[in-house]
Amino acid sequence: MKKFIFATIFALASCAAQPAMAGYDKDLCEWSMTADQTEVETQIEADIMNIVKRDRPEMKAEVQKQLKSGGVMQYNYVLYCDKNFNNKNIIAEVVGE
């Protein structure tokens, strides 16, 4: 049942029209620090790809390549816990611009 609830949350979050723009979401921050790492990585990747799709679709292949090379968890803090990070900057963060 717990996995079903998380799957539903991920599905809804992945389909959201706009990902969060602020780098701080108290609930997501707390969840991402305690949840299963695989689930967190899946959510981080979905959120990053939603930002790419909305802001810089031409970067989709490059961002996917970088995310697949590993280290998805390194974006956890800036996406969900950093009050000073604007999530629009995540693409530059991922591809090293």
From Swiss-Prot:
Disulfide bonds join C29-C81. Keywords: Disulfide bond, Host periplasm, Host-virus interaction, Signal, Superinfection exclusion. GO terms for biological process: superinfection exclusion. InterPro entries: SPACKLE_T4 (IPR046391). Residues 1-22 form the signal peptide. It is found in: Host periplasm. One of its GO terms (cellular component) is host cell periplasmic space. Belongs to the Tevenvirinae spackle protein family. Inhibits viral DNA ejection into the host cytoplasm, thereby conferring the infected host bacteria with immunity against secondary phage infection. Achieves superinfection exclusion by localizing to the periplasm and inhibiting the activity of tail-associated lysozyme, thereby preventing penetration by the tail tube of incoming phages. HAMAP family: SPACKLE_T4 (MF_04159). Monomer. Interacts with the baseplate central spike protein Gp5; this interaction selectively inhibits the lysozyme activity of the baseplate central spike protein. This is Protein spackle. The gene is sp.
